[in-house]
Amino acid sequence: MKNLVIVESPAKAKTIEKYLGKDFHVLSSVGHIRSIVKKTKDGTPPIDVANDFFAIYEVDPEKKKVITELKKNVKAVGKENVWLATDEDREGEAIAWHLCKVLDLPIETTKRIVFHEITKDAITNAIKNPRTVDMNLVQAQQARQVLDRLVGFELSPVVWQKVPGGKSAGRVQSPAVRLLVEREREIMKFEGNSQFKVTAIFIHDNQEFKAELNQKFDTEEAANEFLNSLKPAEFIVSDISKTPGTRNPAAPFTTSTLQQEANSKLGFSSKATMASAQKLYQDGKITYMRTDSVNLSGQAIAAATDFIKRLYGPDYSTVRKFKTKSASAQEAHEAIRPTDITLETASNNSYDQKLYDLIRRRTLASQMSPAKLEKTTITIDIKGNNLPKGKKLAQFEAKGEVITFDGFLRVYGGNKDELLPKLQSGDEVNSHDITARQTFTRPPARYTEGSLVKKLEELGIGRPSTYATIIDTVQTRGYVEKGDSEGQPRDVIVLNYNGEEVSRSIVQEKTGSTRGKLIPTPSGELIADFLTDHFTQIVDYDFTANVETEFDKIAGANLEKSAMLHGFYAPFHKLIEQSGGIDRSKVGANREVGIDPKTNKPIIARFGRFGPMLQLGETDDDEKPRFAPLPKGAKIETVTLEQALEMFKLPRIVGQTEDGQDIKANIGRFGPYIQVGKLFVSIKPEDPHSITLEKARELYAAKLEAEAAKNIAEFPDGVKVLNGRFGPYITNGAKNVKIPKATDPKTITHEKALELLSATTAKPTRKRVVKKATKTSTKKK
């Protein structure tokens, strides 16, 4: 072994070593190796603000073995023969710098290589063209890391103290939560109206086609009047217009457009998309997946062009060079594309293969000819209808589209032809069915993961490497959740004219589906309001985007890291110092919903430690108040007295088990459940108000069966051998011990269990600090 190459991931190491040959040994750092310390031994701050934000780093405990192995190999080959091949973004550059520090490698001379695809040509070319660690990129990454750490370290304690149920606040995820909250409130304020849209099914030469009236009616009466006016009418073609058109392909994928399209077409979350893309990149199947460039290399364009001509013919090939609109994009990087455009199957994993196929087809389409279309509009006059004079002339319009040359649609986003019959001006067509259907204006759409990524990109918030993390974090914190409702039924009026008479019917449609949509939780709304009121800069879109721009300036050597950090920190820290004066009792206002008719006590909707809840009675009363969760979908501002009274009917006795134990149905922090003795059983998606005894017994029996399978052995002193989420283990209630892989858990005796328990030092239980709350009245404000 003459050379040592250090990469980030073990999977990538194997692929690269295969290309480099016997003179190179490739090892992995397994991602980041150091992070800013949480607490120093001597009490000094982890980030010294007065000393130009100097940060103290420590090797992550789980990486100590990795570092030992790397040091041994560095010593074997010599420092001059070490190559740092971490990823080509700022995070990768920072990892290279940390490796230099930990492995005592000279930053000025240690060879640094980058490549945006794991192919033999790319790796060989990188070895021929090494550089050194780019300290501007390192400084930009450190600025982001320090800033985010300072915001989290100083702002989160304020959130814990002042916001009921508050968990944390972050520099980038907080504006994302605000976006979702603002959209939700737009939806809540939206006042829709309805109109009647008229459509007709016409017939000509035994071919049916659809047409739409060129006006809508505001009332049922007006729509009904129009349909009745058609009883003596004839329908005559008055105009036929044909317009040629073209449709051009989209650019190859960037990180954000890949996440948007994978969410839209495949239903993938941003996190799942990036996990699959990472695997495909490490396997050498696609180029680097964190990029904001739409550029393709000349070699990639040539390969795609050759493949298109061979497979589809020269008419399908159109060479394009896309330009990135983003000023911060690095054109030296490439868009996400296959490393071998001829390869159709890249993975045995169905998710990875679906994503690869999407990337491959998008890349091919970007170098293919436009699709050619012919759009046809047929105008149909109504002759002889008896509408009163002065009414607007009504005409039907039928629109069709024929693809005369499919071009890029051959591989990406194909459409079906919308065919119309061959007609001439003056032809009469027969009406088969004419319908006036009530339609409703739609509120603004809730964000999906894909559309939120698009909005964040438009606002300049976040970068390719952070979008998936932002969306994952706001959900993990409990500020945002994914909806699962199919929507609520809504009555729709339908008027139908069959050529003789007008009939009226009511049909139902679903409205307001939240499936797959991102919805802010009450805690998310509360934190967004709190930050907007007291820490405006943290949730201000322009400010957050400007911070991202300043990171870009540091990376481009156009701004000093310390100057940027001082500019942000001084006003931010001043707000932290002033936060002591914020009155917690005024954060998240209480609302009296009404009076309980049974007890004559007020029912109050308010925020508690775990989020919004209902309270029956005052905290100052001699009798302790009762508590209940808000009904699903209700808010403090909107919950009704009727809904609240229903919640206080819980817990409800559903009936008894076969051995006579009460089955109680209730709702807790984690949703609806039944309780039998000390056993709790989730009943999602059942309603605790209406779950039947039969269903409750069925779920209880299934839980007992699962518990029985979990218990391998139980001894008289309380020691148990159990099947757990991560495998079999022994517990005495205070300490858990994993059973060695070579040991069959069914053979463990009481003596052996005690031996294993005593051989393992118990991990100290972290004491939860309970905040002392000041007793305040919850009377209506």
What kind of region is each of these model predictions?
Residues 2-3, 15, 74, 132-133, ...:
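Basic, low-complexity terminal or inter-domain segments flanking catalytic cores
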Residues 10-13, 30-36, 88-92, 116-121, ...:
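Conserved nucleotide-binding/hydrolysis micro-motifs of P-loop NTPases
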Residues 261, 265-269:
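A conserved hydrophobic secondary-structure block that centers on an alpha-helix together
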Residues 118-202, 242-246:
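C-terminal or mid-to-C-terminal helical accessory/interaction module adjacent to the motor/catalytic core
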Residues 218-251, 259, 424-430, 437, ...:
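Metal- or metallocofactor-binding catalytic centers and their adjacent structured scaffolds
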Residues 237-240, 248-262, 287-291, 443-455, ...:
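Short acidic, hydrophobic short linear motifs in intrinsically disordered regions
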Residues 1-145, 154-155, 214, 313, ...:
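Intrinsically disordered, low-complexity regulatory segments
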